[in-house]
Curated annotation (Swiss-Prot):
Induction: Expression is regulated by the hypoxia responsive morphology factor A (hrmA). Part of the subtelomeric hrmA-associated cluster (HAC) containing genes that alter the hyphal surface (such as reduced total chitin or increased beta-glucan exposure) and perturb inter-hyphal interactions within the developing biofilms, resulting in a loss of vertically aligned polarized growing filaments. Consequently, this hypoxia-typic morphotype (called H-MORPH) with altered biofilm architecture leads to increased hypoxia fitness, increased host inflammation, rapid disease progression, and mortality in a murine model of invasive aspergillosis. The lineage of its organism: Eukaryota, Fungi, Dikarya, Ascomycota, Pezizomycotina. GO terms for biological process: cell adhesion. It comes from Aspergillus fumigatus (strain ATCC MYA-4609 / CBS 101355 / FGSC A1100 / Af293) (Neosartorya fumigata). This is Subtelomeric hrmA-associated cluster protein AFUA_5G14890. Keywords: Cell adhesion, Virulence.
Length: 132
């Protein structure tokens, strides 16, 4: 497993921790920050430990509705987030990534439906971490 992928998995595990999942879920499905601002994490301690931050994009997207009871061709509105490396990160792999790509480069874009369930939210994060 590459260093960045391993760091991403650790970050997702931290977000999905039972003590953080409820707050994270709400922040991603009903963000209250302005576009371009960090949605999660909000504390400097978490930012340093997780090594990544997720910034709210300036738009939403229509994504295919893949729920079992959805009508063919149905879509859902999704919030768009930019997964970025934190300059405060302690991980060597994250620091290397920043050195090569810059501190504001987007690692990956996430689309989280506004009506997502916690299970869908977990799947979105886990799938994104696997793609690193």
């Amino acid at each position: 497993m590459s260093g960045l992928k391993n760091s991403g998995k650790k970050a997702v595990d931290a977000i999905l921790n039972p003590q953080k999942i409820d707050v994270a879920f709400q922040k991603f499905t009903r963000p209250t920050v302005a576009a371009g601002k960090t949605t999660f994490p909000t504390s400097q301690r978490d930012l340093k430990n997780i090594g990544f931050h997720f910034d709210l994009a300036d738009h939403t997207r229509q994504v295919p509705d893949t729920r079992p009871n959805a009508k063919p061709g149905a879509t859902r509105t999704a919030n768009v987030f930019h997964w970025q490396a934190a300059a405060e990160a302690e991980s060597k792999s994250i620091k290397d990534w920043i050195r090569k790509n810059g501190s504001h480069a987007v690692i990956q874009t996430l689309e989280v439906p506004v009506d997502a369930t916690k299970e869908e939210f977990e799947d979105i994060l886990k799938t994104a971490a696997k793609k690193l």
